[in-house]
């Protein structure tokens, strides 16, 4: 029994080292990419599984398997961009429209009634984020601390930036059915992020809320389009995928590349909502030895040293499973 226990402990230690090595390999790849490219697309090495597998082959391990996946965190809707920080008292109107279109795309009208309708949800999220407003409720459907303190168990509104995406489940109107994916429809959790904060003047901060159109999934692209154009989202995704196979003839550094699609001449995406680059990425590193497994999920941000001008990755979050 002691021998088995020792072997299991050794495997867990090895797996932890393997998974950590995968994250650091991904960070090095992202830093290299930033030094070589001024935009980010699914054609780049960090997004191509075969390229990542080649790099993993260079990490020597006596046993076990290691896999790494990198995704663009700013391909998602930035929840904290819904209001204008640092005072957080005013809506970002373009983000309000983004939320409304997204909710109406992922859920049917029957699921978006009463407290679950887009206006009610957006108002409640704003009240969760805002501060210094003397508990003023947004519209007829928002919710401040007094609402949450009457629940069982009671809790207070954050009145500040959301720090963990699961906080959305605490907000009036956001049910598990809306938050999580289900067999019939995607949920908020797959397409939103708390990351994306940018420095403002002095010590202030804000969330620009720009979404990388080169990496965004279909439901997010649908939210970028007007309600009358949402059925075109799949055409954008398919064109982008086909363009990846002929990337030398397509310019992903131009956020209006979607205009190249036949029939898209009159389609307009709000330029304040899109970008073609990102510096925030999610890395998932999975290691296994026989039936024993370990995973690390890290969110990192690319930063440049002001003196050396060298790019590195700063860890924003690190979760071990």
Predicted regions and their residues:
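Compositionally biased linear targeting/interaction segments
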Residues: 1-321
């Amino acid at each position: 029994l002691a021998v088995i226990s020792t072997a299991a402990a050794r495997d867990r230690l090895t797996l932890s080292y393997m998974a950590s090595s995968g994250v650091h390999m991904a960070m090095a790849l992202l830093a290299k990419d930033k030094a070589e490219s001024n935009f980010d697309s699914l054609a780049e090495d960090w997004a191509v599984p075969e390229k990542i597998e080649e790099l993993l082959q260079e990490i020597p391990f006596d046993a076990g398997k290691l896999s790494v996946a990198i995704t663009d965190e700013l391909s998602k809707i930035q929840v904290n961009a819904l209001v204008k920080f640092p005072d957080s008292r005013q809506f970002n109107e373009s983000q309000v429209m983004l939320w409304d279109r997204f909710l109406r795309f992922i859920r049917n009208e029957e699921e978006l009634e009463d407290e679950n309708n887009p206006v009610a949800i957006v108002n409640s999220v704003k009240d969760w984020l805002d501060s210094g407003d003397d508990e003023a409720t947004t519209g007829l459907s928002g919710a401040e601390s007094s609402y949450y303190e009457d629940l069982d168990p009671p809790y207070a509104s954050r009145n500040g930036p959301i720090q963990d995406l699961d906080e959305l489940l605490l907000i009036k109107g956001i049910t598990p059915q809306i938050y999580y994916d289900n067999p019939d429809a995607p949920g908020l959790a797959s397409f939103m992020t708390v990351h994306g904060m940018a420095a403002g003047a002095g010590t202030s901060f804000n969330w620009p809320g720009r979404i990388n159109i080169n990496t965004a999934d279909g439901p997010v692209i649908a939210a970028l389009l007007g309600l009358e154009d949402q059925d075109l989202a799949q055409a954008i995704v398919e064109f982008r995928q086909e363009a990846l196979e002929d990337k030398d003839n397509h310019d992903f550094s131009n956020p209006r590349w979607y205009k190249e699609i036949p029939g898209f001449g009159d389609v307009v995406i709000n330029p304040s909502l899109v970008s073609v680059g990102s510096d925030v990425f999610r890395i998932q590193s999975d290691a296994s030895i026989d039936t024993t497994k370990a995973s690390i999920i890290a969110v990192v941000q690319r930063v440049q040293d002001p003196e050396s001008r060298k790019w590195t990755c700063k860890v924003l979050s690190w979760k071990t499973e």
